[in-house]
Structure formats: structure tokens, C-alpha cells
Amino acid sequence: MLPKRASFLVSVATIPLLFGYHAIGILMFTVIAFMMQFFRDPDRIPPSDEDLIIAPADGRRLSGKIDRIERVGSDYPLIDRIFPDGSGGILISTFMSPFDVHVNRAPVSGKVIYTEHVDGRFQVARSRVLTENEKNLIVIKTDYGNVGVIQIAGFVARRIVQYVKEGEYVERGDRIGMIRFGSRVDLVLPENCEVLVKTGSRPMAGETVVARFNPGKKRVNVQ
């Protein structure tokens, strides 16, 4: 069943058809279908194990996928806001195509201790644009360490929306923001996490397990 707002828009789009303006009616239906596809926000069910880390972004349609998994040092942009002690972390970067769900979700449960919006350019998000593109950082404190989610704008995606504020507690899988018309989301984890996905994986935000907290392990090999 269509949401009430969508049903209303469909009803409006039928008016030109009733008066013989078929081209206008078809155009309106096309625009409405696109907006419904883009702004869809399906429910997701996260796993129950508290040590699991889930994908913050979708990467399932067409070119959407996890395209970077690597260890990053203390010189990586914004990482000092995530790990103030100067340590490095593990980066899992997901490219979102314009056809993916664009709502971003909390990868872990914890307290939002820091957020920062950084103005910048709007280059294609496939390149290494973290230093230049507009971005938004959300840092979540957990019992296992801090986790950072970096929403990055791109050539098409020119608006980042943040749903949470500093001081709020989020549950894993909660909606924390949105990037309109695709782009990329970088997930930065503590070094002792165990990565459970590979480059090329196609995650589902709020459900796909991408890593596991492993506080007893000092170092994890990342390929």
C-alpha cells in the first residue's frame, strides 16, 4: 500500500491525464516514481550480538559496493577526532550508487560524543576526495572504543543530512543521517577489530555485518 503522501501525489498526477495532457501526466508519474524510489526507507533488522558492527550504508545496486578496506594512520583526515590518543584505525569505505537506499544507520550502539560538518567541494566520490569534499563526521563511543562514520558528498550528492546530535544514545541500526543522491560513507573502526567483509562486497545498511570488536587482539591484518 502506498503511503498517504505518495497516494496524494499519484492522484494529482492523474489530473493532466483526465484532461488529455498525456505528456504532462506521464512526466509527473515519472518524477513521482523516481522520488519514491530515492526516498524509500525500508525497515532493517540488525543482528543481536553486541560485538558485531554493521554496515552504515547501502552498496547493493549497480556500482554500489565496498571499494576500500585498509589500515589508516593518525594522519588520515578527521581520524584525530575519532581517536584523540593519536592511534590509527581500520577504514571500510562504501560507495553508494544513486539507486541505493540513501539513509545511513548507526553501525554500533553507543553515545554520540562528537559531530562535525566540514564544507568542501563536490568531486566524484570514487576518488580519494576525503581531504577536499564536503563531509560530515559522527563519532560514537562504545564499550569497545570509538567508531567514526564519515558521510561524504559527491558530484551528484550535494546535501548531507544528520539526524542525531551530540549527547544522544543510538542503538545499532538506528537512522543517523542521509546523503541525497548517493555518494560514499567511510566507517572508521579501532585497530583491534576483525573485518568480516571484502572489497567488492555489497552491504545492506542496518543488517550486513562488516566487522567484529575483538578487544583481546592487538592487531588485525587488512588486505
Curated annotation (Swiss-Prot):
Entry keyword Nucleus: no
Cellular compartment(s): Cell membrane
Cofactor note: Binds 1 pyruvoyl group covalently per subunit.
Positions of the catalytic residues: S183 (schiff-base intermediate with substrate)
UniProt-listed InterPro entries: PS_Dcarbxylase (IPR003817), PSD-A (IPR033175)
Pyruvic acid (Ser) carried by residues: S183
EC number(s) stated in the UniProt entry for this protein: 4.1.1.-
GO CC, one annotated term: plasma membrane
Primary residence: membrane
Keyword Zinc applies: no
Post-translational modification as stated in the protein's UniProt record: Is synthesized initially as an inactive proenzyme. Formation of the active enzyme involves a self-maturation process in which the active site pyruvoyl group is generated from an internal serine residue via an autocatalytic post-translational modification. Two non-identical subunits are generated from the proenzyme in this reaction, and the pyruvate is formed at the N-terminus of the alpha chain, which is derived from the carboxyl end of the proenzyme.
Cofactor(s) recorded in Swiss-Prot or TrEMBL: pyruvate
Entry keyword set: Cell membrane, Decarboxylase, Lipid biosynthesis, Lipid metabolism, Lyase, Membrane, Phospholipid biosynthesis, Phospholipid metabolism, Pyruvate, Zymogen
Reaction(s) catalysed (UniProt annotation): archaetidylserine + H(+) = archaetidylethanolamine + CO2
GO biological process: phospholipid biosynthetic process
Membrane topology note: Peripheral membrane protein
Subunit details: Heterodimer of a large membrane-associated beta subunit and a small pyruvoyl-containing alpha subunit.
Role: Catalyzes the formation of archaetidylethanolamine (PtdEtn) from archaetidylserine (PtdSer).
Assigned protein family: Belongs to the phosphatidylserine decarboxylase family. PSD-A subfamily.
UniProt protein name: Putative archaetidylserine decarboxylase proenzyme
Organism: Methanothermobacter thermautotrophicus (strain ATCC 29096 / DSM 1053 / JCM 10044 / NBRC 100330 / Delta H) (Methanobacterium thermoautotrophicum)
